[in-house]
Amino acid sequence: MARQTTVSAACDLGGPPLLWDKLDRMRDCASRWHHNAVTYAYPAGNDRPERRPLDVVAHRGASDDAPEHTLAAYRKAIEDGADALECDVRLTADGHLVCVHDRRVNRTSNGRGAVSTLELADLAALDFGSWKAPTGEHEAPDRDPERDNREHTSVLTLERLLELVADSGRRVELAIETKHPTRWAGQVEERLLALLGRFGLADPPRDDPSPVRVMSFSARSLHRVRAAAPALPTVYLMQFLSLRYRDGRLPAGVDIAGPSIRIVRNHPEYVARLHRAGNRVHVWTVNEPEDVELCARLGVDAVITNRPKAVLTQLGRR
């Protein structure tokens, strides 16, 4: 436990806190999450304000402007006004949840190897951002270049992302995707729910919309989540439209569909089918203006995009 706390702190921008300071900070973050969720909650009954026809979710952060899954990308998405942040989580060899999409780190870092075979300290030594040059709008006289560089290049733990959202001062939702298959099987969901529990997010009140939802292409993963945390919303992601769910039904206990934009383009009537079955619809990855327009016209509930600022501007919300 002592090693886990020390390693986790090594990836923290604020330096290594003592164990009791870390626990106090987590309790404080849980309080701020609750404050933001309640103060800026949607109206009762999951009804969304009429002024917002669909939610804009930042895919791996504002990943068109900053390296994906870095603190810089998520900070930019919050500054741009994204309603929610999307992240992928994987389990390291020493049991930490990190925000990395690929099974291996080769594409997004200067290292090699599978995330599941590397410890957090190994990942903390890698550069996860220099492959993507930051845009000019991040350069401001009052910014700390050293901090900015760390935020653009350091591996991001889910714990640190939860802290960032807690500090946002407004309601920012989080869509967390579990990556499968994995050598850790159900341990990913177990560790995820334990971490959410420490932030007071694993058991949201049934009469309030949860600020966190869990997504996966794996129905088995979602079943594990629903069994352990039945009040937590789950999203069934779909790359292709299978015959099994063509009528609008979803796996048991799931009430949010996550079809790809390709499915929506090829089968626009599917959105209405999902809605008739009582499901919400979150579409990924929606970057092009014509796709944003299509989703708005069809009445989807959320679009997941690499370009939250551009989408919000197109929707007249900036």
Whereabouts are the PLM-identified features?
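Phosphate-group recognition and catalysis centered on beta-loop-alpha active-site segments
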Residues: 2-7, 11-13, 18-318
